[in-house]
């Protein structure tokens, strides 16, 4: 469901030759989030939009509530749906953005226009969310003691080691509110 402001009526300006739905980045992000919540209620979704000179984009992050990535087949369905709302693709061979051909419409044939330039889907929680920190903690637990993680492990040991050492070490990367939420999640989940 979109706000009424997304509907542009024929003749509302001198350039509007037909009624259409303006699918800017903000509206696209909203539609994708609604889709995920409706069809995949166990999936946590973050959908944000950015507008900048020369274009716009939508970032979609999905995970389970414990921070783990969702099943690959579900992620592919979400990505496929999300990518329908991308205006085109960048062709690096000729250094040019190429717009998709054809017209997309709603079920009642109202045209959808002016999509974001890019839609990015990530099978991981949004940075800074509680789910992100839960994912990072589980990642550390899985890799602790390996050669690639010895320096990180030693930093956590300086903060007392274990779950509390990990929390204390990573606190500087969190806002106070995020830290409180992560502490609460650690008490109830881990």
Predicted features by range, described:
Residues 1-190:
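Intrinsic low-complexity, intrinsically disordered or marginally ordered coil/linker segments
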């Amino acid at each position: 469901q979109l706000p009424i402001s997304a509907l542009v009526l024929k003749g509302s300006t001198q350039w509007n030759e037909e009624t259409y739905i303006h699918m800017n980045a903000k509206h696209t992000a909203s539609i994708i989030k609604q889709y995920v919540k409706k069809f995949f209620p166990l999936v946590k979704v973050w959908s944000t939009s950015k507008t900048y000179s020369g274009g716009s984009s939508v970032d979609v992050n999905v995970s389970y509530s414990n921070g783990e990535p969702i099943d690959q087949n579900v992620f592919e369905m979400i990505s496929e749906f999300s990518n329908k709302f991308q205006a085109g693709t960048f062709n690096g061979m000729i250094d040019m953005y190429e717009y998709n051909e054809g017209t997309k419409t709603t079920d009642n044939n109202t045209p959808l226009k002016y999509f974001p330039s890019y839609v990015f889907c990530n099978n991981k929680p949004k940075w800074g969310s509680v789910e992100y920190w839960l994912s990072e903690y589980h990642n550390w637990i899985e890799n602790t003691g390996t050669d690639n993680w010895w320096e990180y492990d030693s930093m956590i040991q300086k903060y007392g080691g274990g779950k509390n050492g990990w929390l204390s070490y990573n606190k500087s990367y969190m806002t106070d509110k995020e830290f409180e939420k992560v502490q609460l999640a650690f008490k109830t989940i881990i």
